[in-house]
Amino acid sequence: MGKTLFQKIWDAHTVGILPDGRTQMFIATHLLHEVTSPQAFGMVRDLGLTVRHPERTFATVDHIIPTDNQAEPFADATADAMIRELRRNCAENGIRFFDLPTGLQGIVHMVGPELGITQPGMTIVCGDSHTATHGAFGAIAMGIGTTQVRDVLATQTLALSPLKVRRINVNGKLAPGVRAKDVALHIIGLLGAKGGLGFAYEYGGEVIDAMSMDERMTLCNMSIEGAARCGYVNPDRTTVEYIKGRLFAPTGADWDKAVERWLGFASDADAEYDEIVEIDGASIEPTLTWGISPDQNTGISGSTPNPSDAADDDERKMINEALEYMKFPADMPLKGLPVQVCFVGSCTNGRISDFREVAALIKGRHVAPGIRALAVPGSQMTARQCEEEGIADIFREAGFEWRLAGCSMCLAMNPDKLQGDQLCASSSNRNFKGRQGSPTGRTLLMSPAMVAAAALTGKVSDAREVFSLN
């Protein structure tokens, strides 16, 4: 009987089985940022312990970083204290910290892949919800809480419960103008915001095989929005070529050995899955959210739902709550809905390929009057690449605010925030109430191409029509 990638990695990292049935797992790589690590370091210190494997631990700063002016001290005293605390903790424990002056700082889920830290076959954890991003490389990557961050710092292990594995096959071919973000939102809408509870998602099929690593990262990044503990893609030659030559990638004879080992983690042809879901890629259209959860979404040709069509009282209640918060009527077409803010960035869609695509679409055009448009690269490496390729200038000339690297408007932990009831077309990952900084601000999740279309027209628009992508 063959094994899935999940089973292979789980078995390879099992230290032992605990009396309660959980598995004590060795953690290959631990990623840190400034928000969830201070308390964990404090607990380790209070216990009289030290960091067990600093060489397997990497840190960066991303959530609280201002993206307009990163001169220190920061205007926000709390943010300034947080970065200083992370510096202290990393220095005291010998942890590699990709700080602002290094030129390698960025969102943690971009820094790991860009530097070659993220590799197939690893167990990877971080005190951040979107750690599943690293699963794009054929790793088992999970977000953890602060007490678990403490445990990994002190022991390099973690007590975890086994997961079921759901294989999600997306076959056929995507229509022109349909992107990885649309696939991710479609899957979440199909399976639900709680559909992945207790599961690891294995993404496969012709559409996934054809995706670039950036696209696979977008897909895996959104796994948690469907409640999956992790999501991954089997490693292949696309994976290998992405890692090759990066700062932490193996070299020489070690490279050849690593590649052979990495590819061996891919699920066997006769592996058995707990569930298999089949999706026709051709059926997916540009997709966007209409409510306050990522599963509340529809294709660009769709409308807000009618509560009277709900399957049960619970669903009816959720629809009513979402429509009330979003200030939308039932049965309202989303196409043509005016927006006030547009955001390209985040660990979901803040990569070089995202900015290349949008730059090609907006070149020679301009943001619609009255629209605030932000472009925020997810890392300093990506920002430099955009400057070198002339991409940043295209955004500036089109009327976008070109920002420094950080999480920015994805969440309300830095100065980039919505005001009042503003409606934002966003390439980020969550549309929860108040997520983007204003307690009444509203978010429409969509692909970068769709954000670009909204920025140029001032309203929700079909990117295929605006940019003649058909």
Curated annotation (Swiss-Prot):
GO molecular function, one term: 4 iron, 4 sulfur cluster binding
Catalytic reaction(s) noted: (2R,3S)-3-isopropylmalate = (2S)-2-isopropylmalate
Sites where the protein binds [4Fe-4S] cluster: 347, 407, 410
Cofactors named for this entry: [4Fe-4S] cluster
Keyword Oxidoreductase set for record: no
InterPro entries attached to this UniProt entry: 3-IsopropMal_deHydase_lsu, Acnase/IPM_dHydase_lsu_aba_1/3, Acoase/IPM_deHydtase_lsu_aba, Aconitase_4Fe-4S_BS, Aconitase_4Fe-4S_dom, IPM_dehydratase_rel_enz, IPMI_cat
Cofactor details (free text): Binds 1 [4Fe-4S] cluster per subunit.
Pathway: Amino-acid biosynthesis; L-leucine biosynthesis; L-leucine from 3-methyl-2-oxobutanoate: step 2/4
Superkingdom of this protein's organism: Bacteria
EC number(s) stated in the UniProt entry for this protein: 4.2.1.33
UniProt feature, compositional bias: Polar residues: 294-307
One Gene Ontology biological process: L-leucine biosynthetic process
Keywords from the named record: 4Fe-4S, Amino-acid biosynthesis, Branched-chain amino acid biosynthesis, Iron, Iron-sulfur, Leucine biosynthesis, Lyase, Metal-binding
Pfam families recorded: Aconitase
Positions of region (Disordered): 294-313
Protein's UniProt keywords contain Nucleus: no
Function: Catalyzes the isomerization between 2-isopropylmalate and 3-isopropylmalate, via the formation of 2-isopropylmaleate.
HAMAP family, alphabetized: LeuC_type1
Subunit structure: Heterodimer of LeuC and LeuD.
Family: Belongs to the aconitase/IPM isomerase family. LeuC type 1 subfamily.
Protein name per its UniProtKB record: 3-isopropylmalate dehydratase large subunit
Species the sequence originates in: Akkermansia muciniphila (strain ATCC BAA-835 / DSM 22959 / JCM 33894 / BCRC 81048 / CCUG 64013 / CIP 107961 / Muc)
Name of the gene: leuC
